[in-house]
């Protein structure tokens, strides 16, 4: 029979990309929004929820994550990317087992649900464990097993990660009524050899898959790639056929005008990760240049080990204010554009055209914020309120496909105490 949200403020996006708020009603039947209006609908709903002083908006989409890395939160703080990754992170990851990934994924999901994230894109190891966690929790996710190769003598047939990735796709793609999608993933240029990248990229294209990569995260990465191959990482991936599939490229901090032209030509989606890039001292993506080129720009937290949380409201805040300060121009990026990055642009990147906005016929991926807070009054500009004033702690409800997964501090699908118990056991073993 469905759920009717009554007397709430609704964040609506017009066809022109502008945002407005409507005070009224929103109805959900099954997994779909079936009513939006100022008058109470005549149809019957099984459940009625009074939402005075609440704002309903699309769920946030975290397009670049390594969710089990919540177990490494704070490891190697203060180091630049390469030293952090090779000296601190990789040695711990070498000791991870599937049970660790299961525990870390569920802990990350608790954090994401409570902070208004309804879908995320993930690349990591033992991804079937993350698939199971997402299925249990009721979230949406694009999950991938990232491929690496440090040995130039390793043949394609000897690389065990490639068949693991393909098997994951064939087994789980579009599972749970499409809530779970499987992507292909290459970690980065500096962690994979060309012959592996070319062969794996061909497999992705043959399967009609989407690709998730790290790309031009630092100037050092670009300089070393040019020294090795005579071209930038962007041009390198283009030459090897990776960009021939729908691609999500995380970071793109150190990209030239020529790189941006390549990204545009291939329809590459770029994921802006402001907190991680700032924390690791990597720099800041040329947001305005990318958007002016017509590139779809989404938003991500990166893993909690380099952030150190999965809070998309914090990402929106930095994505809003940092370009303006860096360029000495308060019009460099608008709050509405940042809100798009965290919602509709993220949906586009994940291949989910049926979500990302509140509209009749769209999937009911909805979050509610409590506006009855000192820091949220008055409100003269809702996008700016959300990107520059709201906190993740203002989230009081998270719904995915019409099912409430989190409400007023209570998780509906996961046992919070069990998740913490299992996560503590993993941390104790890893860091004993």
Where would I find each of the regions flagged by the language model?
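Active-site microenvironment of metallo-dependent hydrolases
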Residues: 1-24, 29, 39, 342-432
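Divalent metal-coordination and catalytic microenvironments
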Residues: 8, 26, 31, 53, ...
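Active-site gating loops and adjacent loop-to-helix segments of metal-dependent hydrolytic enzymes
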Residues: 71-103, 110, 140-162, 219-246, ...
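Alpha-helical scaffold segments that flank or form the walls of functional sites
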Residues: 73-139, 162-175, 423-432
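Metal-coordinating catalytic core of metallo-dependent amide/deamination hydrolases
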Residues: 129-253, 258
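His/Asp/Glu-enriched, well-ordered alpha-helical/loop segment
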Residues: 239-246, 288-373, 389-391
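A conserved active-site cap/scaffold subdomain adjacent to cofactor or substrate pockets
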Residues: 258, 264-295, 300-301
